[in-house]
Design a protein with these regions (language model features):
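Terminal presequence/propeptide segments associated with secretion/organelle targeting
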Residues: 1-720
Length: 720
């Protein structure tokens, strides 16, 4: 995950792997390189410009939130998709922004001058915060653009990004969930993968081609920098690059911090969510109504659950702890002898002492969050605080009733997708887990209630859900209808409120302050440890941990062999999609039109030897935030859009191993096929004037026995 300005130093390695263009074509500060075609999509995804008229390609799941604001019962874009027939039909997405990184510059000297390595963080942070504000203002004034400074290498370096954010972004194309979310949670974090995870937007600008608020008078943003599209394909071993905005990685932490992940937080989260998902799955199987209520929530909970399992698997299989300990042994030997970093000698011992003291708190807090606060009724107990606030105000009875009703109406989103009987069974399962593991540290209220209910969690659960007004919207509305000034006691006596208040009091007064002090201490130690590692290995070119800033990763198209005997291909195809079709399943139901196109093998110019590629694997280092990232070939041409990782390699957030870690991308040819043949929006493809020419030139120059591909009687590409 290299900072773009670093890649000049990586050029030899990149070319040895197959790069065919100069690195200054990938990044430069003149505005003529590929970095000017990569955008931060919204607040946490990546997108790529694919036409001179501001057309943006990103993931289906990145556009999901914006499309949700546009869809309705009579315009269900999730079920049917959406394809604009022209620019007039492109739909404004309120609140969605697109940010370009115009250039990046190392400003460490401006931020850290006269700031010592061992200066305590409170004083250090005060100085740095003031300097960042001043330097950002300086760059913004000079460039007439926005400037954002972020820390790198745990605060040992600072870089400024000169950015330009556009506020008028419109939906252009969005495949239905039967394509864009195909496979759902079942295929999430998995390979083989069959999801057409893409969507299309367009950025608009004012008359001066600069950012502007939405206006019907705005024009498509004009740019000379956009990605050429290659439909020539790829083969295993081909060079690839991924450009984007990876969110968070922690590759340089100590073994003590890594142990917290794979031995404490991940296992607890996995165990708690396994229990919750088991209960939800049973109830969803028994009731269609509950299935619909819990589908989205289940996907959200299962997302982390599956990722963490892969993370633990990968860390153990790759002996991540062994590698950390071996490195730390050498580090300590160096620190004992070398005087260039005098602060380094005691770092590992201090880290061990700090983590040893914090581990019991981290253990307890993870159970608090995943087990206790994993129960929806207890979460909802927090919302009762808003009702209590109504009684603290000096309101008349009628005004109080009206205010309570409005507050309760705001909770409708929760009760629309809530089933008390299902949650009661979750309570029984998770509370048993909590008592089995946290009996000594749990709130006293929990112990007394357990004893009061004859130490029978089932009995306790039935009583809680029977008595709590938070278990249904009807109970809350009934309470609000006749609420008097003295009725605040009814809320304070509600079991959901008491369960939440008890755990919240323990967390806020005992656990969170102590953990905040620990994290503050570790931030200081991590910064010094990162500094010492860079001093120790002066010849090594380090890349900083991800922090949602522009990065480039490179690797190769490469299949994988996960645990077991199965050897998977590096590519999937449409035939596999159709083979998975299940009309009774919300996540494996293939749209009829797509099945018809497959049956007729009507792939247009996008198919390859009678097949339609769908997704492929490569060994690029990615993480959250790389969703929607352009995947490029050796010539910097777009061959796909990144959207996921197989769970066997999710440990790459802590240890990247190119032999095990993979990124999953949707093939650009599948994207073009869906746009053209399924969506009937071929006019969008015409905007990328280089698409056909690039494919033909590559095939002609690189294939020993190319054959001509015909489309509508015209030669449009060579295949091989």
């Amino acid at each position: 995950m290299w900072i773009p300005a670093q890649i000049k130093a990586r050029e030899k390695d990149m070319k040895a792997m197959g790069l065919q263009i100069p690195t200054d074509r990938i990044y430069n500060e003149t505005g003529t390189a590929l970095n000017n075609a990569v955008v931060l999509f919204g607040r946490g995804c990546t997108g790529e410009i694919v036409s001179p008229k501001g057309l943006i390609l990103t993931n289906h799941h990145c556009g999901y939130g914006s499309v949700q604001g546009l869809t309705s019962a009579d315009k269900d874009y999730f079920e049917h998709g959406y394809w604009a027939n022209n620019m007039n039909e492109e739909l404004p997405c309120k609140g969605l922004t697109i940010t370009f990184i115009r250039r990046m510059e190392n400003v460490t000297d401006k931020i850290l001058t006269a700031v010592s390595d061992t200066m305590k963080d409170d004083r250090r942070d005060s100085i740095i915060t003031k300097r960042i504000a001043a330097v950002e203002k300086e760059y913004a004034t000079a460039t007439h653009l926005d400037a954002m400074i972020k820390p790198y290498f745990e605060g040992n370096q600072y870089w400024v990004a000169i950015t330009e954010t556009f506020r008028d972004v419109r939906l252009v194309g969005f495949p239905p969930n039967g394509i864009g979310a195909f496979g759902g949670d079942v295929e999430n974090w998995m390979w083989p993968r069959h999801t057409g995870d893409f969507s299309i937007f367009r950025v608009y600008a004012g008359a001066d081609n600069r950012p502007a608020d939405y206006s019907a008078a705005n024009k498509p943003y004009h740019t000379e920098q956009f990605f050429n599209i290659s439909i020539a394909g790829y083969k295993e071993g081909d060079f690839t690059m991924v450009y984007g905005f990876p969110g968070t990685t922690k590759e340089y932490i100590s073994s003590y911090e890594l142990k917290e992940v794979y031995a404490v937080t991940d296992p607890i989260s996995i165990a708690a969510r396994t229990r919750k998902l088991d209960v939800w799955t049973k109830h969803m199987h028994d009731s269609r109504d509950i299935f619909l209520k819990y589908t989205s929530k289940r996907a959200s909970v299962a997302n982390g659950w599956k990722k963490w399992q892969g993370e633990v698997l990968g860390l153990k299989a790759n002996d991540a702890m062994g590698k950390k300990l071996a490195y730390e042994k050498g580090f300590q030997q160096w620190a004992n002898k070398d005087k260039t970093a005098p602060f380094a000698n005691s770092l590992l011992a201090e880290m061990k002492s700090a983590t040893d003291a914090a581990d019991p708190l981290i253990y307890q807090e993870q159970y608090n969050k995943e087990a206790v606060l994993g129960i929806e009724l207890i979460q909802q107990g927090a919302s009762l605080e808003r009702l209590i606030a109504c009684f603290r105000s000096n309101l008349t009875d009628s005004a109080r009733v009206d205010t309570l009703r409005k507050v309760i109406a705001g909770m409708a989103w929760f009760y629309k997708n809530y089933d008390a009987a299902t949650d009661r069974d979750v309570f029984i399962s998770l509370m048993q887990m909590y008592f089995d593991n946290c009996a000594e540290t749990m709130p006293e209220y929990y112990k007394t209630q357990f004893a009061k209910h004859e130490k029978n969690i089932n009995y306790w659960a039935y009583d809680v859900y029977k008595r709590s007004m938070a278990s249904s919207a009807e109970k809350l509305n009934s309470f609000a209808a006749t609420a008097k000034a003295a009725d605040s006691t009814k809320i304070l006596e509600d079991p959901a409120w008491q369960l939440f208040d008890a755990i919240n009091t323990v967390r806020q007064h005992r656990i969170i302050p102590a953990l905040n002090a620990y994290y503050y201490q570790m931030h200081y130690l991590d910064r010094l440890y990162m500094k010492a590692q860079m001093v120790k290995d002066k010849s090594k070119i380090f890349y900083p941990d991800a922090n949602l800033t522009l990065r480039l990763a490179y690797g190769q198209v490469k299949g994988m062999k996960p645990e077991g005997t199965a050897k998977y291909s590096f590519q999937t195809n449409l035939g596999e999609v159709v083979a998975l079709d299940d009309p009774a399943s919300d996540i494996f139901r293939v749209p009829k039109k797509l099945k018809d196109l497959y049956k007729a093998r009507d792939y247009g110019r996008w198919g390859v030897n009678g097949e339609m590629p769908v997704a492929f694997l490569a060994s690029n280092h990615t993480t959250g935030g790389n969703s929607g990232s352009p995947v490029l070939n050796a010539r910097g041409e777009l061959i796909g859009t990144n959207f996921d990782r197989p769970y066997e390699g999710t440990m790459s957030d802590y240890l990247f191993d190119p032999e095990r870690c993979r990124n999953i991308s949707v093939d650009i040819r599948y994207i073009l096929f869906i746009i053209d043949k399924f969506g009937g929006a071929g006019w969008l493809i015409d905007e990328n004037e280089h698409c056909e020419k690039v494919a033909m030139n590559y095939a002609f120059n690189n294939c020993s026995s190319p054959s001509l591909m015909m489309y509508k009687g015209e030669a449009i590409a060579f295949t091989y």
